[in-house]
Regions:
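Tubulin/FtsZ superfamily GTPase core signature
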Residues: 2-380
Length: 380
């Protein structure tokens, strides 16, 4: 994580019962030492597991108004989850059917490997069967390693076998969250293959299956074609997806961070964020920086830039809820004309949502007006 002083680049055996009396009770064996091996058991192995605080992953060091955890499923999901882990979201798990796709820098404590499997071979039906059969292993890992989180962000790559099968685990995620009395929901973040990748019928079919499966849940779709188009020519092929994953993670992390802060102008708080995230359907997240906000068309510029520069497909129709978070310099908020433009921009974007939550935050060294836009509860 970046230095917080540098604001330029911020964005979880019963005691033995009294034995029944015997007809020929010659000796009291109640206090007799009993070993597991006397019963033909392997020591430290049993149906009832004992959990300790030592099993819990460290608390998130990244600031967040929400008690949040991340789970990456499959190769693509593992890489997306790793981007959040590197930002300080320590309550992150990587679930996979093969260890070959786990990023090399991820500690073993964050990894959950499905036993007796070595990948799914892009077979979603088989993937769903494997994940369903091993749901108890994943549920135990969630409870033991994450403890209690209120919001669970599940990341998966569309096109592969394991990631595209992720919704087979939805009952597991919900059962875990009920067991720890979570107040939030499961939010999916799934990727859509590039145009070239979609030429492969199996990849295209798997991606479509995943997109359809998450439709009824809160979800974000990241279009890899848009991501690579934005980075092509500036980033080499090897670093393209890691950079795209980091960009999305940083943008979402800023929303989580800013919602912890008070603003002398207008705050976007945790309840606002929860209201946005709780809407079922697709969500859009985009951001932009505008060097000179001294324009009467600031609202349309923000909306246009956020849509064109986001990895998410542009929203269609009116969102059930949304948020516009602005980060401005002291000079901007002190300028009456710019302040009026900021108010107009919030109203303009608000017309695209049934309910818009907004926040305006001041930073000393901000290089331009930063805008982070989310639109939630989209029907498509």
């Amino acid at each position: 994580m970046s230095d917080p002083k540098d604001n330029k680049n911020e964005f979880d055996f019963l005691p033995p019962a009294e034995p029944p009396p015997s007809f020929n009770q010659e000796k009291d064996h109640y206090h007799e030492q009993v070993d597991a091996e006397d019963f033909g058991m392997v020591e430290d192995f049993g149906l009832q597991m004992e959990y300790s605080d030592e099993d819990l992953l460290p608390e998130n060091t990244a600031p967040s108004s929400l008690n949040i955890g991340f789970v990456g499923v499959g190769g693509g999901g593992n890489k997306m989850a790793n981007a959040f882990l590197e930002l300080g979201f320590n309550k992150t798990l990587l679930v996979n059917t093969t260890g070959k796709d786990i990023p090399k820098n991820v500690a073993e404590d964050h990894v959950v490997l499905i036993p007796d499997s070595d990948g799914i071979g892009k077979n979603v039906d088989y993937g769903k069967e494997v994940l369903s059969q091993n749901g108890a292993i994943i549920e135990d890992a969630l409870r033991i390693k994450l403890g209690k989180v209120d919001w669970l962000v599940v990341l998966a790559g569309g096109g592969g076998g394991t990631g595209s099968s992720v919704t087979a685990l939805h009952p597991v995620f919900e059962r875990y969250m009920r067991s720890v009395q979570s107040s939030g929901k499961v939010v999916y973040v799934v990727s859509w293959p590039t145009a070239q990748e979609n030429l492969n019928p199996t990849i295209a079919r798997n991606a479509l299956t995943l997109a359809n499966d998450v439709t009824k849940h809160p979800h974000v779709i990241l279009d890899n074609e848009r991501s690579t188009r934005l980075l092509r020519g500036r980033i080499g092929m090897l670093g393209m997806y890691p950079v795209a994953n980091t960009q999305f993670a940083k943008s979402f992390a800023q929303v989580l961070k800013l919602s912890t802060e008070d603003s002398p102008i207008q705050s976007f708080d945790s309840k606002d964020l929860e209201t946005c995230l709780s809407n079922d359907g697709r969500a859009f997240l985009g951001s932009t920086m505008i060097k000179d906000p001294n324009t009467a068309k600031l609202g349309s510029v923000i909306l246009h830039n956020c849509m064109n520069r986001s990895s998410c497909p542009p929203p269609k129709g009116k969102a059930a809820a949304g948020s516009l978070i602005l980060v401005a310099s002291e000079e901007m908020v002190a300028d009456p004309k710019v302040s009026k433009n900021l108010e107009s921009a919030i109203s303009y974007v608000g017309g695209r949502c049934e309910t818009l939550f907004s926040g305006v935050y001041v930073r000393k060294n901000v290089p331009g007006l930063i805008a982070i836009l989310s639109m939630n509860g989209l029907k498509q």
